[in-house]
Design a protein with these regions (language model features):
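Glycine-rich, acidic loop regions that bind phosphate or pyrophosphate groups
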Residues: 64-173
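Short, mixed-charge, low-aromatic patches
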Residues: 2-6, 43-47, 113-119, 163
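Anionic-ligand anchoring segments at beta-strand to alpha-helix junctions in alpha/beta enzyme folds, i.e.
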Residues: 2-3, 10-13, 19-97
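Generic anion/oxyanion-binding catalytic loop in active/binding sites
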Residues: 6-9, 145
């Protein structure tokens, strides 16, 4: 069994991380889609820290285990495949969006921002791009994003928290 161990999670690419930090440091009304994540207490705590540091409104998905505390003041409600009500309003009023391994991010963005309508910068943290080659097309749509960080949310959130703690001049690579 030792010969079949899982590889370590990839670190976020430096340029993508710097671009994400630049977007988030300027954001006044960020929004976080809290998607898939581990059951780790430290990952849970880091998601809360990120939302609080950014003062970002958050949502979770009905089909996933909780990705953010539903009693937290920054949580505005959970959603399924259709975005509506206060969740949709918060997404549309956001000036930056972070998708933490969200289910079908491409469809979520299309529902919130119809083709031709303006939308904020989107940071996608997910390894889902690996499945966007399947012949059956049952993976959902490829999300059109401004920054793609190909790793698991816990690794990227930790790096974002570290980067947001630094002065803006230290974030440039």
């Amino acid at each position: 069994v030792a010969h079949f161990s899982s590889p370590e999670d990839a670190e976020p690419p430096k340029k993508a991380l710097a671009k994400a930090l630049n977007i988030l440091s300027k954001a006044e009304k960020p929004f976080i889609f809290c998607g898939r994540g581990s059951r780790s207490q430290s990952e849970w705590d880091d998601r809360i820290k990120l939302a609080e540091r950014l003062n970002a409104r958050t949502t979770t998905h009905l089909k996933l285990p909780a990705g953010f505390p539903t009693t937290h003041p920054l949580f505005i409600g959970e959603t399924g495949w259709r975005l509506k009500g206060p969740v949709l309003d918060a997404i549309r009023s956001a000036d930056a969006i972070v998708m933490l391994d969200w289910l079908d991010g491409g469809n979520a963005l299309k529902l919130a921002f119809p083709p031709g309508s303006p939308r904020p910068s989107v940071i996608n943290i997910s390894n889902d791009f690996h499945i966007h080659r399947g012949w059956s097309m049952d993976y959902g749509g490829l999300a059109a994003v401004d920054v793609s960080i190909p790793t698991v949310p816990s690794t990227a959130v930790s790096a974002l928290l570290d980067g947001l703690a630094k002065p803006a001049s230290a974030r440039q690579l």
